[in-house]
Every structure is written in structure tokens, then in C-alpha cells.
């Protein structure tokens, strides 16, 4: 277990088992229990690794949003694994996934979270064009510095230029 307290891990395991039990009853078959990991960084709350039958959760966002993770994020990621096991490769938030979210877990098929991400958000850098300013992530900023990418304003079509200002 990485960066997570035992009690929180226990609650996550309980939620995971409850989801698989619901799916087993609903589909009248036995699904393998997914592996739970806390090795996810950035702004994503969770991610399902389909071939590995693994769910990775963002430990920082989990600590800050315990109830939502247990009631929404874990079922969301389990639904991805179930969709893959039942239907193979289909659209990530397509009709099959939505039917599992709504039919099995009785949850809305939301595709994104609304968590505050200030604690996990990386550094941003200010870029500008003729008409406005843009915050670029550190990943995009580094690509510009290494001459691997350039970014263009969709409005004025000018290449964005670094202002020299780090925003966060």
C-alpha cells in the first residue's frame, strides 16, 4: 500500500468487494476480484487497467474525498473492468459502460469528477498570443522548451509565447 492509511484501504476494499458482489448477482456469474493500488498521480481520481484487472486510485484525492471515492469513483472504475470483461474493447464511457453504471450500481453515468484539484495540480506557466494569455501545464511547457511541440491559439492562430511567468 502506498501513501494510504489502513482504515481507508479497508474501506476501499469493502467498497470494491460490494461492487463485485453486486455484479456477480446481477450477471449471475463470478468476476475476478480486481487488485487495488494507490499509484495514481495528477488530477485523475481513478484509472482502470483492463488487462491487469487493476484499479489505481489517486491517494491524495482519495483522502480529501473519501465518501465520493467509496460511493462513486470505485464503482466507476469497476464498471470499466466489468465492461471489458463482458464486451471486450468498446468506448470507455459508451452504452455498455453506462448500462453497468445505471443498471448494476444504480448510479448516474458521470464521466468526470468535480473534486478540487489544487493539492494535486502541477506547476503551470503563463503563455500568450496576440489576443489573450494561457496557462500551460509543466508537461506542455517542457515540450516547448525541448522544441518537441508548439501551441497555437485557436482564435488568432498565433503561436503561444512563454511570458517568463510561472503561475503555480
UniProtKB/Swiss-Prot annotation:
InterPro entries: SprT-like_domain, SprT_Zn_ribbon, Uncharacterised_SprT. Binds 1 zinc ion. The active site is at residue 77. Belongs to the SprT family. Its cofactor is Zn(2+). GO terms for molecular function: zinc ion binding. GO terms for biological process: response to stress. SMART domains: SprT. Keywords: Cytoplasm, Metal-binding, Zinc. NCBIfam families: PRK04860.1. It comes from the Bacteria. Zn(2+) binds at residues 76, 80. Pfam families: SprT-like, Zn_ribbon_SprT. It is found in: Cytoplasm. Residues 18-161 form the SprT-like domain. This is Protein SprT. PROSITE patterns: ZINC_PROTEASE. The keyword Lipoprotein does not apply. The gene is sprT. GO terms for cellular component: cytoplasm.
